[in-house]
């Protein structure tokens, strides 16, 4: 039977001051490592470091929804990853249409290694893709690894 290890990097809600905001790491037995939600600020880096999970180990991010306590750490995750692995492929980000709108706004609002963003990807100042967007729909299945599939469902909060 397939196994999966789940590490909680944050379980706090938007108003939480004592807990990092929502972020979870799924390590699947096919080698797929998936970050679900990116918390806020540098919480993923701090909590991940405590558990031996470096930010640069993420190649795939799935954002549950567009609230800042679930996705505002995205820019920091891709920035730290790009510093540690400058030649790595783009960070694959799976998100809803509404979350994509907010992700593009976040890219425009800060300059952590992103010079431009459109509905396909975010690029650095050299024109290199640093994040690639995949919009997902409710009831869609998304292949994330050799034996890892995500099943998307309508949700306004997790």
Question: At which residue positions do the language-model features occur?
Answer:
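Binuclear metal-dependent hydrolase catalytic cores
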Residues: 1-158
